[in-house]
A protein has these predicted regions:
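Short, structured segments at the rim of ligand-binding sites
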Residues: 1-217
Length: 217
């Protein structure tokens, strides 16, 4: 995967996956146009900025009484993430990709008050733990708090990541981004579920230089 610059229009939850890719890939840049900047929608970005992410908002204006603007993301050297339970409601959908980011930051990241993630389209805590373990990243969940023992991966690790048929679009996309960042081969069953929220996901991946093929697994 080469360094890249790209503009992605639209939804902040869908763009979160490419935000992760941008932050962790050297010399990369992302611009997301016309994003809703209501404080209840941008917990993901606020949390990452606390960890050193180079994320800024520009061209802000009110549209139908809602704040809208462009989100600009640049490659960053991130510190481990410490997400208290107050972030849960504003960041619910983005936790799987936050777990991926944490896995690739050297040090311990903590996520508190996230027990409800066990009751989404899949048990997102358990399933992401399984995925991260396949690249050698350990984690522990206890009393509503997840610890991820991240490690910085400098070179392609050429691992194989297998994701079963969970029917969970956010797990699928998170695993795909993990594969792009680590050089791993990822096999994801029922990837079609991604179309429910991000029908252009694979198209954008291809534009960035990623490769994929569809098989009957």
């Amino acid at each position: 995967l080469d360094k890249f610059s790209i503009n992605v229009p639209g939804d902040p939850s869908s763009a979160a996956f490419f935000t992760a890719l941008t932050l962790l890939k050297k010399n990369s840049y992302l611009k997301i146009k016309k994003v809703g900047l209501n404080p209840t929608r941008i917990g993901f970005y606020s949390l990452l900025k606390k960890s050193g992410a180079k994320i800024t908002f520009s061209n802000k204006k009110k549209v139908n009484n809602e704040l809208v603007g462009d989100v600009i993301v640049k490659s960053s050297s991130l510190r481990p993430i410490n997400a208290s339970k107050k972030y849960y409601l504003n960041t619910t959908d983005e936790y799987p990709i936050l777990f991926v980011i944490s896995a690739l930051i050297k040090g311990n990241s903590f996520f508190s008050g996230i027990s409800d993630l066990k009751n989404k389209e899949s048990d997102r805590i358990k399933e992401m733990q399984k995925i991260l373990k396949q690249i050698g990243v350990l984690s522990k969940f206890k009393n509503g708090k997840l610890l991820i023992k991240g490690k910085k991966i400098e070179k392609n690790i050429t691992k194989k990541i297998n994701v079963p048929n969970l029917g969970d679009h956010r797990i699928c996309m998170s695993a795909a981004i993990l594969g792009l960042l680590t050089g791993s081969e990822v096999r994801i069953k029922n990837f079609e579920t991604v179309g429910t929220s991000s029908p252009n996901f694979l198209k954008i991946v291809k534009q960035l230089g990623g490769s994929f093929e569809k098989k009957n697994l």
